[in-house]
Amino acid sequence: MDLITSLQEITKLSHLYYERQWMYATAGNLSTRDGSSRDQFWITASGKHKGELKDTDFVCVSVADGTLLKASDGLKPSAETSIHQVLYSQMPDIGCCLHVHTIDSNLLEFGVGKEEGSREIPIPPIEIIKAFGIWDEKPNLTMPVFYNHTHVPTIADEIKRYFISVGIPKVPFLLIEGHGPTVWGKSIAEANKHLEAVHFLLQVMARKV
């Protein structure tokens, strides 16, 4: 998929997620790896209303170090750009990352401490996890949950440490407590599928609390 088409697809998802109440106002951020240059990615610019996003409301960032490479006048990278940069750098095969602020993901409380940084939380072995390509019967799965530091690069650093020390999660997402999930996939379509499954999973978990 060429870059223009990719940005158009991400823009459509932004409008859809706004309608689903997954990204109110300027909350959330979506990105796609540049298919013609996989060492860079395009992410929604900071301060853009997700229900009114245009396919020109993106900036280009380096996968290697998060350096801003291209941006139209006045556009700045999303606040969570450092998290996307870590995900693309740690997983060279992924092509899309989606971060939203759903109600259920904010209702879930695990009490991850600031000094603790992160914790693996068990997830129920329900049918929807097949959307992640996991077909084992009643698998014993966990999801990484991270403390919601005000300084977002600190969250990104803890995610990187987790990936290096623990490994890539078996499930294609992570959760920032009191904030929202971030999912990834090899393509925009796969990442969207994963996000829909994660939304359902977190709904179930929120109702069990």
Curated annotation (Swiss-Prot):
Q: Which organism is it from?
A: Leptospira biflexa serovar Patoc (strain Patoc 1 / ATCC 23582 / Paris)
Specify which residues bind Zn(2+) according to the UniProt entry for this protein.
99, 101
Q: What is its EC number?
A: 4.2.1.109
Question: By which gene is this protein encoded?
Answer: mtnB
The record's comment on cofactor binding reads:
Binds 1 zinc ion per subunit.
Q: What does this protein do?
A: Catalyzes the dehydration of methylthioribulose-1-phosphate (MTRu-1-P) into 2,3-diketo-5-methylthiopentyl-1-phosphate (DK-MTP-1-P).
The upper taxonomy is: Bacteria, Pseudomonadati, Spirochaetota, Spirochaetia, Leptospirales
Name of the protein in question: Methylthioribulose-1-phosphate dehydratase
Alphabetic keyword roster:
Amino-acid biosynthesis, Lyase, Metal-binding, Methionine biosynthesis, Zinc
- Similarity annotation: Belongs to the aldolase class II family. MtnB subfamily.
* Keyword Cell inner membrane set for record: no
Cross-referenced Pfam families: Aldolase_II (PF00596)
Q: From the UniProt record, list the reaction(s) this protein catalyses.
A: 5-(methylsulfanyl)-D-ribulose 1-phosphate = 5-methylsulfanyl-2,3-dioxopentyl phosphate + H2O
GO molecular function terms attached to this record: methylthioribulose 1-phosphate dehydratase activity; zinc ion binding
Q: What SMART domains does the database record attribute to this sequence?
A: Aldolase_II
Q: Which domain of life is it from?
A: Bacteria
Return the GO cellular component terms, semicolon-separated.
cytoplasm
Which PANTHER family does this entry report, sorted A to Z? METHYLTHIORIBULOSE-1-PHOSPHATE DEHYDRATASE
UniProt entry tagged with the keyword Amino-acid biosynthesis: yes
The coenzyme or cofactor needed here is: Zn(2+)
GO biological process terms, alphabetically, are: L-methionine salvage from methylthioadenosine
User: What is its pathway?
Assistant: Amino-acid biosynthesis; L-methionine biosynthesis via salvage pathway; L-methionine from S-methyl-5-thio-alpha-D-ribose 1-phosphate: step 2/6
